[in-house]
């Protein structure tokens, strides 16, 4: 299959992966309205084309949390990444490291902190949930710090799991799920050999290290279901600060008031995110939520954004809407599933090229020059409360 755009990786991944894994990452909550709007709203953001601006010295480099990034992109935390390619977290981290951008390790990764961190030169980021087992949280923070992780990404939009109906149909959960997953695995030989046979162990490395015993997929589902904590509050940030003194980013912000609270409670950054449409269906897309949040806290805190970003043009759109940088999730996982580290490296090359084209044709020589002035306001009235966007078809 010819890979000429990031979207090609999705089609390739669907052929390679067992359905339970493809639909786990591809799907969203409930009827998946927010999942679709994440992509559609962002695709409808119209950029303002400018010409004859002498763009010969264009630069994508930026700084974030005292780190220099080759472009304003980081790889988002993705659970079970190591089930999509052999030791997937290690491969994805290597691709990000070579590109000069951060990789974020998920709490529920297959490869533990201690396996991934020594393989890269750049300090990785670590993502943490608020869980009932505070002993695990403290253990994870201490291990992340000991491994040299530079930034903590604290996910706050999962006090309870979202209702992901696709999982019951695909075999991730539901009746006879284990048997269905087994049959899917043996009928997808490329994945079965690369990951099923050679990608072991398949446990959740960070959790296994804490519990002192292997953990499989069933353990993953059960452990998370029993440990999400609906009592989460802003005071939990104060507790985390007892064990973490580096940059802390709050992931899962969709409302300006929550963004202001993040500033008040001393966070260093926020991620404008609806968890890729996987938690509460019907909430605003990140593209629609971002401008009002930027108006509220831009300059007071670093603003990152995710959900719906599929290519370099989308990165430029998010920055024009108010983000300082973005996180890539599904896009890089499709590439990882298709060609491993090389796939992620190629995806990042594609994104860089697409960003350069977009910046060249909008007259922005640097990341700091991408702003709301880069948008055609008549078509880009994204903030909640303004006129709806013109209808279009998502790319």
UniProtKB/Swiss-Prot annotation:
UniProt EC number: 1.1.-.-
Lineage: Bacteria, Pseudomonadati, Pseudomonadota, Gammaproteobacteria, Enterobacterales
Gene: lldD
Gene Ontology, cellular component aspect: plasma membrane
Binding, substrate: 24, 129, 164, 278
Annotated keywords: Cell inner membrane, Cell membrane, Flavoprotein, FMN, Membrane, Oxidoreductase
InterPro entries: Aldolase_TIM, Alpha-hydoxy_acid_DH_FMN, FMN-dep_DH, FMN_HAD, FMN_hydac_DH_AS, LldD
Catalyzed reactions per annotation: (S)-lactate + A = pyruvate + AH2
Organism: Enterobacter sp. (strain 638)
Official protein name in the record: L-lactate dehydrogenase
Alphabetical list of HAMAP family matching this protein: L_lact_dehydr (MF_01559)
Keyword Oxidoreductase listed: yes
């Amino acid at each position: 299959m010819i890979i000429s755009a990031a979207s090609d990786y999705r089609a390739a991944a669907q052929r390679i992966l067992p359905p339970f894994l493809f639909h786990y990452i591809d799907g969203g909550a409930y009827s998946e309205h927010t999942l679709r709007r994440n992509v559609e709203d962002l695709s409808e953001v119209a950029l303002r084309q400018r010409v004859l601006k002498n763009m010969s010295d264009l630069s994508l480099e930026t700084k974030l949390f005292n780190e220099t990034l080759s472009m304003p992109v980081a790889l988002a935390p993705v659970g079970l990444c190591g089930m999509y390619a052999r030791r997937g977290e290690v491969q994805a981290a290597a691709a990000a490291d070579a590109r000069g951008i951060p990789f974020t390790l998920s709490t529920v990764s297959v490869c533990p902190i201690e396996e991934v961190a020594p393989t890269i030169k750049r300090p990785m980021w670590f993502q943490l949930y608020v869980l009932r087992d505070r002993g695990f949280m403290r253990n994870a923070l201490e291990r992340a710090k000991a491994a040299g992780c530079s930034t903590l990404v604290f996910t706050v939009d999962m006090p309870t799991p979202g209702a992901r109906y696709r999982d019951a149909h695909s075999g991730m959960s539901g009746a006879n799920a284990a048997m269905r997953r087994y049959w899917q695995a043996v009928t997808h030989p490329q994945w079965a050999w690369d990951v099923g046979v050679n990608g072991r162990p398949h446990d959740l490395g960070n959790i296994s290290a804490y519990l002192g015993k292997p953990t499989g997929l069933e353990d993953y589902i059960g452990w998370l279901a029993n440990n999400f904590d609906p009592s989460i509050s802003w005071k939990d940030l104060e507790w985390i600060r007892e064990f973490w003194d580096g940059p802390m980013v709050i992931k899962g912000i969709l409302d300006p008031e929550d963004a202001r609270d993040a500033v008040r409670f001393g966070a260093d950054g926020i991620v404008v995110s609806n968890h890729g449409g996987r938690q509460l269906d019907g909430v605003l897309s990140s593209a629609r939520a971002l401008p009002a949040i930027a108006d509220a806290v831009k300059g007071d805190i670093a603003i990152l954004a995710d959900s719906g970003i599929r290519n370099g043009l989308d990165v430029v759109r998010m920055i024009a809407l108010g983000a300082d940088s973005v996180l890539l999730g599904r896009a890089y996982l499709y590439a990882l599933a298709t060609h491993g580290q090389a796939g992620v490296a190629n995806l990042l090359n594609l994104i860089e090229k697409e960003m350069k084209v977009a910046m060249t044709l909008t007259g922005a020589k640097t990341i700091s020059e991408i702003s709301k002035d880069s948008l055609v306001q008549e078509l880009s009235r994204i903030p909640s409360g303004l006129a709806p966007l013109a209808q279009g078809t998502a790319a």
